Amino acid sequence: MSLRIALLNAAHDGEDNRRNFRRELDADLVEFDVTDRVLPDHFAFDACLVTGSRASVYWDEPWIADLESWVDDAIDEGIPFLGVCFGHQLLAHTLGGTVAPMDDYEIGYRTVEHDGTNPLLAGVDEEFTVFTTHSDHVAELPPGATQFAENDYGVHGFRKGDVFAVQFHPEYDPATAEDVASGKDLP
């Protein structure tokens, strides 16, 4: 029996997210377009995943407040979480950490190092290459969280209990990375 995972899709055009996570996860993904304020009305999932977004967690948007409230309740219910990019930042913020704008935009294939302590990256070389695209970062970890991955731009992975979060995009394939990078209007 496969896992039932709530895919809390925060991308404003979620087609790539949907395709990439369905390819990478052997699970029954139940998708919710959280940018339209669509959230589960229950907590009957084996796990939840919060995707990336072009939004910032500190924006005053009703959908972000709704998402953060639901995530907080789901964590209290003991549901395991994975956050990717915006999801990483949202989980940090929800758990009491600080998210802030960066001085430089991090985009492209980057080297990240992990400390070998986290089962999420078991079997991955301690120095590995990932695709990143973000202009915000976790400036301060939530109380009780442990960092397990980083690079020169900052925190790239943390864990608190059954909540795991990564700043990079493990789900991106080369076509998605190229599409995302070519669509950015950078200084």
Please describe what each predicted stretch is.
Residues 33, 55, 87, 136, ...:
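Catalytic metal-binding/acid-base residues of hydrolase active sites
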Residues 1-69, 73-77, 187:
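N-terminal beta1-alpha1 cap of cysteine-dependent amidohydrolase-like domains
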